[in-house]
Regions:
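Surface-exposed, hydrophilic segments of mature proteins
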Residues: 2-6, 14-16, 23-25, 32-212
Length: 212
């Protein structure tokens, strides 16, 4: 049957951090007394660094999978940097035009559809999705209505815990390798001017080093 090759882009991280170094000169002049003083304010630039892990994923589970097979797959993000972060996951699921069966054995018409399904966990919000011929893309923010701050050293809840291969009729995809790709993104929480998940995701996407 089908093999899954796991390609997890576990460090596609976005660093948007800055510091303004302010120089302040304070002078006071009097008729007979002159006093001058100056102060230089020093700032240290922090960083945003995240990592992704799937502690329960077993690559052997992805070998020779069968219809309706459920596999453990539990991506989560850890803030490895020095600054609070807002984080996102983008999941790309392979699609194909295939025929499937219902639980009672009846057949469905051939259709272009996702080859794997999953159920997202509490704490994550779907903010964007798209379907193409070869893949679907789902973008989740670590958020409720507003973004949730991920402090340094903290780890998110898992986005999902399992993936399920659809009930495909055999011999349609034999010998093919199927990839579920999970990209993770993080950005500083300060000075963004918004806490809207979609607006912040768009800020990340506007950075030149992030693939869209």
């Amino acid at each position: 049957m089908t093999n899954i090759r796991e390609r997890i882009s576990n460090k596609r991280n976005v660093l948007i951090a800055g510091a303004l170094i302010a120089l302040m000169a304070i002078g006071s002049t009097f008729a007979y007394f002159v006093d001058r003083d100056s102060v230089t304010n020093s700032f240290t630039v922090g960083d945003v660094e995240i990592s992704v892990s799937e502690p329960n994923w077993d690559p052997d589970e992805g070998l020779d999978i069968t219809p309706n097979k459920v596999m453990k797959k539990d991506p989560k993000i850890t803030n490895e940097g020095a600054n609070d972060a807002f984080v996102f996951m983008r999941v790309t699921v392979p699609r194909a035009t295939v025929k499937t069966a219902n639980d009672d054995g009846t057949l469905n018409a051939k259709a272009n559809q996702d080859l794997f399904t999953f159920t997202s966990n509490s704490g994550w919000k779907l903010i964007k999705s798209s379907n193409g011929t070869l893949s679907s893309e789902y973008v989740y923010a670590y958020a409720a209505d507003k973004m949730t701050v991920l402090a340094p050293g903290q780890t998110t809840a898992t986005l999902f815990d399992t993936v399920k291969f659809i009930n495909i009729i055999e011999e349609q995809l034999d010998g093919q390798d199927l990839d579920i790709v999970v990209d993770t993104m993080g950005i500083q929480t300060d000075d963004l001017g918004t806490d809207s998940p979609l607006e912040i995701y768009n800020i990340i996407m506007n950075q030149q080093d992030v693939p869209q």
